[in-house]
From Swiss-Prot:
Keyword Nucleotide-binding among record annotations: yes
UniProt-recorded name of the protein: Proline--tRNA ligase
HAMAP family: Pro_tRNA_synth_type3 (MF_01571)
Annotated stretches, region: Interaction with tRNA: 346-376
Gene: proS
GO cellular component, one term: aminoacyl-tRNA synthetase multienzyme complex
Length: 482
């Protein structure tokens, strides 16, 4: 494939911590994650390298979900009357819906919406599938694209009009307590998933005015980006019986009665990949967790004329061994300078680089370079597979540890409104304080401190920063991407 974007080893990516927007835009292009030149605003093309990262990320998620969920695939189009059935839900999306009004040259009798989310797509079918208490629980998920006419400033992978990687799970239960247990289970699923990516997260219950439309409550996962803004990366919703009543989803109890089911749903999107890129990357480019990287190992031959063929043969043999052992490996045998190869593979975030030259070959060894720390170690070629596996485990642990440390360093406590305001003026990041959870009080805090309330953490107790009533821990932030 001919490269559509010219690589420049002297290109300035931008300082990640101080010029994050420029850095992020440049890395997406330079590392061939996506091509943003598609002629529709807010829509992009996944390039082969980016698509492999996406594929590997979803592989991790599917491995977790497939333990007790079933994967399905529902249509893209939603009839207007079905979308309109749940008024509260629709009100949350009505300004963002794309409509199909014609089939060819003929005007449709009823408009069809491109799904903004899939409750109104899936739940009419659930009403047909659920019959008896013996059918429950049901747990489904799908990975699809969704469309929202985003009117704010679009940002690739973060705020888009086509969400190309929308994972949504929908579950159906006989009782409210079972739905509550599923919410807790969904939170554990996402914790395991984000931990496997090394992504730090805050878990909060969203304030009532910011919950998912039609839900009883929303639990959200947020992470902190390099520019000091938080990014919502996952949500879990307890839907209660709201949608069951709208779409007549009932089951027969053991006693022969008919009752409405209880439901949950939880989703995440392209933002997960954006957070992996943003949080772990550096001024040299991507720095990917091994399970996500398109290539986990790149082999770079150090060629001198005297032993060129012997070195190449050793590299080819090592590639075969590593592939047989389950590694995703690439042998870079291009006839260009080794330094250029180092630059490109560092920029693309390959976790481990293996260098073999004539001297290494004489010793039966290779030099292994870590992308996350830049450290180099010499390892015997015999048994190098185990060395690489141990290094990959250590790389993930290191990425995870330093990401958590950075986020936690940006959380600051405030005991008064004045102190919270001062932190907003002087710092970026997250403010921790006590909030009673009441909407009127929360709105008052937002106005006085000039922040958005992120939500409530269940742990901790004290008195509300505004009204003085007993309160759990609340979190605010100067800027939040929801």
């Amino acid at each position: 494939m001919q490269k559509p974007i010219k690589k420049d080893p002297n290109r300035y990516h931008g300082e990640k911590m101080t010029e994050f927007s420029e850095w992020f835009h440049n890395i997406l292009e330079e590392a061939e994650i996506i091509d943003q030149r598609y002629p529709v605003k807010g829509m992009h093309v996944w390039m082969p390298h980016g698509f492999m990262i996406r594929k590997n990320t979803l592989k991790i998620l599917r491995r977790i979900l497939d333990r007790d969920h079933e994967e399905v695939l529902f249509p893209l189009l939603v009839p207007e009357d079905e979308l309109a059935k749940e008024a509260i839900h629709v009100k949350g999306f009505e300004d963002e819906v794309y409509w199909v009004t014609h089939g060819g040259l003929s005007k449709l009798q009823r408009k069809l919406a491109l799904r903004p989310t899939s409750e109104t797509v899936m739940y009419p079918m659930f009403a047909l599938w659920v019959r008896s208490h013996t059918d429950l629980p049901m747990r489904f998920y799908q990975v699809v694209n969704t469309f929202r006419y985003e009117t704010k400033h679009t940002r690739p992978l973060i705020r888009v009009r086509e969400i190309t990687t929308f994972k949504e799970a929908h579950t159906i239960h006989a009782t409210a307590s079972e739905a509550e247990e599923q919410v807790e289970r969904a939170v554990e699923i996402y914790k395991e998933f984000f931990n496997s990516l090394g992504i730090p997260y805050l878990i909060t219950r969203r304030p009532p005015w910011d919950k998912f439309p039609g839900s009883e409550y929303t639990v959200a996962f947020d992470t902190l980006m390099p520019d000091g803004k938080t990014l919502q990366i996952g949500t879990v919703h307890n839907l209660g019986q709201t949608f069951a009543r709208t779409f007549e989803i009932k089951f027969e109890t053991p006693e022969g009665d008919h009752e409405y089911v209880h439901q949950t749903c939880y989703g995440l999107s392209d933002r997960v990949i954006a957070s992996v890129i943003a949080i772990h990357g550096d001024e040299s480019g991507l720095c990917l967790p091994p399970d996500v990287a398109a290539h986990q190992v790149v082999i770079v031959p150090i060629i001198f004329k005297k032993a060129a063929e012997e070195v190449m043969e050793a590299c080819r043999e090592l590639r075969s061994r590593l592939e047989a052992a389950g590694f995703r490996v690439h042998l870079d045998d291009r006839d260009i300078r080794a330094g250029r190869k180092y630059y490109e593979w560092e920029m693309r975030g390959v976790p481990l680089r293996v260098e073999i030259g004539p001297r290494d070959l004489e010793k039966g060894a290779a030099v292994i370079s870590r992308r996350d720390t830049g450290e180099k170690v010499t390892a015997d070629l015999q048994g190098i597979e185990e060395t690489l596996r141990e290094l990959m485990k250590d790389i993930l642990e290191n990425l995870r540890t330093r990401a958590w440390e950075r986020m936690e360093s940006e959380i600051r406590e405030a005991e008064t409104l004045e102190e919270a305001s001062r932190i907003v003026d002087e710092k970026r990041g997250i403010i921790s304080f006590m909030w009673c959870g009441e909407e009127e009080c929360g709105m008052d805090v937002e106005e006085k401190v000039r922040v958005d309330i992120l939500g409530i953490q269940e742990e901790g107790s004290g008195t509300c920063i505004n009204c003085g009533r007993e309160a759990p821990t609340g979190l605010t932030l100067p800027e939040h991407i929801s």
